[in-house]
Amino acid sequence: MGKTAIIVEDEIFVALDLERILTAAGYSVVGIAADRRTACEIGRGCDFAFIDVNLRDGPTGPEIADTLAREHNVKVVFVTANPSQIIDDRQALGYVRKPFSESAIAAAAAIASGGTPPPDAANDVILFGDRGRASTVMSA
């Protein structure tokens, strides 16, 4: 069985683009959520989540990331135009900045699912390191 993902994004065209990219890369998207309640309901049991910071119910992305990671062992990658709003990144692997490329999303999905990102995505995903410092993914 393939890896499963949830997309937490309130802009439907962005969410559908993420879904298209993930599906083409072989992942199964279990749903799209635009708010905290929906994300926590359908996110349980997923392998990883792509989460925006600012959603329909406010800047709840970091709270959702914390809940899904801590309570359900879901790997989290933020997809945001506002990475400076990620105050507490302890529960996330890193982030992809909007606007994103297909290669950035594919690389982030590979990392979140325990794989290796493609070499052409070397600088597309920012990983969180110790003490909140970020570093780019380096190609092999």
Task: Annotate each language-model stretch with its function.
Residues I32-F48, R56:
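Acidic, metal-coordinating helix/loop segments flanking the phosphotransfer/catalytic sites
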Residues I51-A69:
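Conserved phosphotransfer microenvironments
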Residues V79-T80:
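Hydrophobic/aromatic residues positioned on beta-strands within the core alpha/beta folds
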Residues K98:
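A Lys-centered signature of the CheY-like receiver
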Residues S101-A107:
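Conserved two-component signaling phosphotransfer/partner-docking surface
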Residues I12-G31:
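Two-component/phosphorelay signaling modules centered on CheY-like receiver
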Residues E9:
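Conserved acidic carboxylate
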Residues G115-A140:
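CheY-like receiver
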